[in-house]
Amino acid sequence: MSEERSFERITKSDLKKIARIARSEREEFFGRHPEWAMLYRKRLVCVALCKDAALHFVNGSTGIDVFDVWSFYAEHAEAPFPFQQFVKADLGKSKFGRDASNPEAYEGRRIELRARSLDCKPGDDPIEVLQRYLRSGETPSARELREKALVLIEPEHFLGYVVWPSLAMPNG
């Protein structure tokens, strides 16, 4: 394993901090883009920790180089969410250390925030929505995300729920 990874345990308190950062970045995005705020501000289905960091939350041994966080929205009939949106944020000082690839730019670990809209309605069960999306493998994002793990960080009552891998669903 690379020394660039942190092997510190991710707690629910850590997930809450990451969720707060994601929420703040989301509001900043909508503030800069009122056209997207009109369509999507009230259509958030869930937010998930993904890829290696999520797998580390599940198994405790993968390690973390970056926290990948995805926000998923119920697709609006007028336009899909601009999924190319990609924002980097700073976790700040923490037990996870600093971003090894660019330590001068970050006080702590890097958080990469992405978002996309999915074929569902506001209020749909986020677990079912994500499992259906990942099982379908219809997009490159779905195929990439299902290779590791997804752990919900919003809505808060699902904080820490492991959506993927799911023992109840076939993995491919």
Regions found by a protein language model. Give the residues of each.
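Active-site nucleotide-donor binding segment shared across nucleotidyl transfer reactions
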Residues: 26-67, 72-77
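Extended low-polarity, hydrophobic cluster-rich segments
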Residues: 44-46, 67-73, 110-112, 149-151, ...
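Intrinsically disordered, low-complexity regulatory regions of eukaryotic proteins
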Residues: 95-100, 104-109, 143-150, 155-159
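N-terminal regions immediately upstream of nucleotidyltransferase
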Residues: 1-34, 38, 61, 81, ...
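Conserved catalytic core of two-metal-ion nucleotidyltransferases
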Residues: 85-138
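Short, conserved charged micro-motifs
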Residues: 76-85
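Sequence-level detector for tyrosine residue identity
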Residues: 40, 73, 106, 133, ...
